[in-house]
Amino acid sequence: MLHRATTTAAAAAAAALLLCPVQALVRPDGVGKLPALGWNSWNAFGCDIDEEKILTAANQIVNLGLKDLGYEYVNIDDCWSVKSGRNATTGRIMPDLTKFPDGISGLAEKIHNLGLKIGIYSSAGWTTCAGYPASLGNETIDAETFAEWGIDYLKYDNCGVPPDWQDQYSYCVPDSGDPATNPNGTCPNLQNPAPAVYDWRTSKTAERYRRMRDALLGVQDKRTILFSLCDWGQADVNEWGAETGNSWRMSGDISPNWPRISTIANLNSFELNSVDFWGHNDPDMLEVGNGNLTLAENRAHFALWAAMKSPLIIGTALDKIDQDHLSILSNKYLLTFHQDPQIGRPAYPYKWGYNPDWTFDPGHPAEYWSGPTSSGDVLVLMLNTESGPANRTAVWSEVPELKGRNNNNNSSSTGFQVTDAWTGSSLGCVQGGYSVELESHDVAVLVVSGEC
């Protein structure tokens, strides 16, 4: 399996992308089969949350047409509970009633009445990342509580881990963005690495997450709760994430700047063999509309996350979003690919462009991507990773899904009907390939259809 970019040979890497994922966590009602679509409070508000902000987001999902496009989860992140501790009598986590005067159950009812679902946050430790009560050792009672409240989604973080639950070995997550620190996707300065034959399924991290998985499955007769693992890519989660949860973080936190987005996209491009129905790599929540990202960078960020079939969890204040950013989040071509009910695999890089193929480069991830759809169309992305404008060309004979789909042996005269996914405009019958001038960090998204 291609893993953590330690392989640079193109043949070995390409073969790895064809491997089947591990046994997945399959739910009888279909929850978690496709990557999640929704909103989360953290990137927009951090700890400064309350019922009004969550309900505003929920109403905006409806009013802006996002619900009609499939966005359904409204997720409360950290800082929702009483920080001083659990209920001394029941042992349950208590919602902070100054922030949520109707409790979480009351808020859940209001969100459900909008035809949406609600998510909540905890951690596989004693405390959350912000120091609030977490769920390690209390998995059963917390799962029961969440089910009783009407929770539909659990984001489960990796903070507050006590010493006796820490892993025996360290794991390499090469997401520093610094090629000197992580040359070719490695961690040469990693302290206490595991032996090559070590099975990370036996790690304490994997066990902490399995405990909550089992607790959630134990209340499944009352409520199905999507399980989103947030262990930052630690403990080789790609190997056991699909059998434990519905999605799993494959890196550290995102931030609203291009170097961080590029770093995460680069790392995830080497780990896409883990993605299929029921299990999805999570490169973290969307930053579309946040920070000082250019419009081009917002487009590239969303297009890559959608093409990789990552969870698309909006992280901006929806009552303040402008039309340009809303249009990106609402792109029907990318969302159709992302939510394809018959094809679970994501788009894969087929050419690196700026670098030789299979180069691990946080500043210049793969630039050419393609993926199939159940309609027979092919999604093609071209990314400009350079710091200035540059031309990019998708040559049809190089796109894996287009090979063999013509009568001219993939000659330069082969033509396909092409649609620009950003404008929705038909580009007509395009012969041989398509060239476009892209601004720095922008992406072209094409839908390639029948021969012509």
Curated annotation (Swiss-Prot):
Residues annotated as signal peptide: 1-24
Glycosylation sites per record: N87, N138, N184, N292, N391, N409, N410
Active site: D157, D253
Compartments it resides in: Secreted
Keywords per UniProt: Disulfide bond, Glycoprotein, Glycosidase, Hydrolase, Secreted, Signal
Database matches in InterPro entries: Aldolase_TIM, Glyco_hydro_27, Glyco_hydro_27/36_CS, Glyco_hydro_b, Glycoside_hydrolase_SF, Melibiase_C
The UniProt record lists the keyword Transmembrane: no
Cysteine pairs bridged by disulfides in the record: C47-C79, C129-C159
EC code(s) of this entry: 3.2.1.22
GO molecular function: alpha-galactosidase activity
PANTHER family xref list: ALPHA-GALACTOSIDASE B-RELATED, ALPHA-GALACTOSIDASE/ALPHA-N-ACETYLGALACTOSAMINIDASE
Similarity comment text for this entry: Belongs to the glycosyl hydrolase 27 family.
Role this protein plays: Hydrolyzes a variety of simple alpha-D-galactoside as well as more complex molecules such as oligosaccharides and polysaccharides.
Protein name, entry field: Probable alpha-galactosidase B
